[in-house]
Amino acid sequence: MQLLTIGINHHTAPVALRERVAFPLEQIKPALVTFKNVFLGPQAPNTPEAAILSTCNRTELYCATDDRAAREGAVRWLSEYHRIPVDELAPHVYALPQSEAVRHAFRVASGLDSMVLGETQILGQMKDAVRTATEAGALGTYLNQLFQRTFAVAKEVRGTTEIGTQSVSMAAAAVRLAQRIFEKVSDQRVLFIGAGEMIELCATHFAAQGPRELVVANRTAERGQRLAERFNGRAMPLADLPTRMHEFDIIVSCTASTLPIIGLGAVERAVKARRHRPIFMVDLAVPRDIEPEVGKLKDVFLYTVDDLGAIVREGNASRQAAVAQAEAIIETRVQNFMQWLDTRSVVPVIRHMHTQADALRRAEVDKAQKLLARGDDPAAVLEALSQALTNKLIHGPTSALNRVNGADRDSLIDLMRGFYQHAPRSNDQSGH
């Protein structure tokens, strides 16, 4: 079985492409079934394994398969599933085999590959991906071991380095951008669309600025109400957004919608109602919540996750010592995992040896039982049984010794001595 990771992320693809390759949560389980069975070979000697990690900044397919064409098949499947031409998608895709796939998983979970260096949200997202793959029956020995090691490495990196300290989060970056547009955030009305973890983080940072008003609009009213109450804000129905958008100076959106929920026309009407006072908008969703054409409006300042990434990277540069320490830990753990992976290659051989030896044992025991039932002497039957087992079990090794010559024979002799530690050496003059 070979490990392989196929994916795109914020390093290789813009948000305009990432949003087209993202998987809504409810699609991941059925997608895993088709990915495994159709493209990773259901007739392979070993059952293929797969997991899908889909976040704002990355979509990745983790695989364990015997299929030598898995790389091409995975890219083709991703292209066909999302109806994106292969020629358009392929230049942005990375394919990481074996140790590269292991190293990548360790770095992702540790926050080293994130837009926000050292952020912890990705670890939870990866655990969710593993849970979903497990529920779909898509994980097996190889990926289970990979992800368990991945979580252990992430814990070690975060516990022994300062990779997560003093990081500039996406939420903090959004506040910094707002401060460039408005002299005082405390004078502004802020609307949050959604009620997930990212919106909660943003609300925390903006609430610390003491805005004039804080409002939460969410598809599930109760959840939006609970979040608003935490920050002494108000909740409003999401359906009221088109008619009330003009009331807000700052709008931050991050929902799980597969289509934009804020269109160009609605924003144009809001700008007109505001008499062209500026609106600061942050779209943290992938796929995007706000139509990109909105950013072309004169009085609208629209930023996406990629835009905020530039501010985040400014804070990343100061923690390179922690990065080097984390990379060293990861490299050691990658080597450890690859050693485990190497041992897995002998498992089929060992299993076959056990099966063959057991078949020989059963055959001789059956023969002995028939002799005993016939009334033969038990001692003679046991002697014959033991002699037959001995002869059959050493037949393979002795035949191999007789077939090889030269250096191969010397190597095989040394190997056999390791198996049968009491075997006499070739220079033994005892005559035995």
From Swiss-Prot:
<comment type="similarity">
    <text>Belongs to the glutamyl-tRNA reductase family.</text>
</comment>
<feature type="site" description="Important for activity">
    <location>
        <position position="104"/>
    </location>
</feature>
<dbReference type="Pfam" id="PF05201">
    <property type="entry name" value="GlutR_N"/>
</dbReference>
<dbReference type="InterPro" id="IPR000343">
    <property type="entry name" value="4pyrrol_synth_GluRdtase"/>
</dbReference>
<dbReference type="InterPro" id="IPR018214">
    <property type="entry name" value="GluRdtase_CS"/>
</dbReference>
<keyword id="KW-0627">Porphyrin biosynthesis</keyword>
<dbReference type="GO" id="GO:0008883">
    <property type="term" value="F:glutamyl-tRNA reductase activity"/>
</dbReference>
<dbReference type="InterPro" id="IPR036343">
    <property type="entry name" value="GluRdtase_N_sf"/>
</dbReference>
<dbReference type="InterPro" id="IPR036453">
    <property type="entry name" value="GluRdtase_dimer_dom_sf"/>
</dbReference>
<feature type="binding site">
    <location>
        <begin position="194"/>
        <end position="199"/>
    </location>
    <ligand>
        <name>NADP(+)</name>
    </ligand>
</feature>
<dbReference type="InterPro" id="IPR006151">
    <property type="entry name" value="Shikm_DH/Glu-tRNA_Rdtase"/>
</dbReference>
<dbReference type="Pfam" id="PF00745">
    <property type="entry name" value="GlutR_dimer"/>
</dbReference>
<feature type="active site" description="Nucleophile">
    <location>
        <position position="56"/>
    </location>
</feature>
<dbReference type="Pfam" id="PF01488">
    <property type="entry name" value="Shikimate_DH"/>
</dbReference>
<dbReference type="GO" id="GO:0019353">
    <property type="term" value="P:protoporphyrinogen IX biosynthetic process from glutamate"/>
</dbReference>
<keyword id="KW-0560">Oxidoreductase</keyword>
<dbReference type="GO" id="GO:0050661">
    <property type="term" value="F:NADP binding"/>
</dbReference>
<feature type="binding site">
    <location>
        <begin position="119"/>
        <end position="121"/>
    </location>
    <ligand>
        <name>substrate</name>
    </ligand>
</feature>
<comment type="function">
    <text>Catalyzes the NADPH-dependent reduction of glutamyl-tRNA(Glu) to glutamate 1-semialdehyde (GSA).</text>
</comment>
<feature type="binding site">
    <location>
        <begin position="55"/>
        <end position="58"/>
    </location>
    <ligand>
        <name>substrate</name>
    </ligand>
</feature>
<protein>
    <recommendedName>
        <fullName>Glutamyl-tRNA reductase</fullName>
        <ecNumber>1.2.1.70</ecNumber>
    </recommendedName>
</protein>
<keyword id="KW-0521">NADP</keyword>
<feature type="binding site">
    <location>
        <position position="114"/>
    </location>
    <ligand>
        <name>substrate</name>
    </ligand>
</feature>
<dbReference type="InterPro" id="IPR036291">
    <property type="entry name" value="NAD(P)-bd_dom_sf"/>
</dbReference>
<dbReference type="InterPro" id="IPR015895">
    <property type="entry name" value="4pyrrol_synth_GluRdtase_N"/>
</dbReference>
<comment type="pathway">
    <text>Porphyrin-containing compound metabolism; protoporphyrin-IX biosynthesis; 5-aminolevulinate from L-glutamyl-tRNA(Glu): step 1/2.</text>
</comment>
<feature type="binding site">
    <location>
        <position position="125"/>
    </location>
    <ligand>
        <name>substrate</name>
    </ligand>
</feature>
<dbReference type="InterPro" id="IPR015896">
    <property type="entry name" value="4pyrrol_synth_GluRdtase_dimer"/>
</dbReference>
<comment type="subunit">
    <text>Homodimer.</text>
</comment>
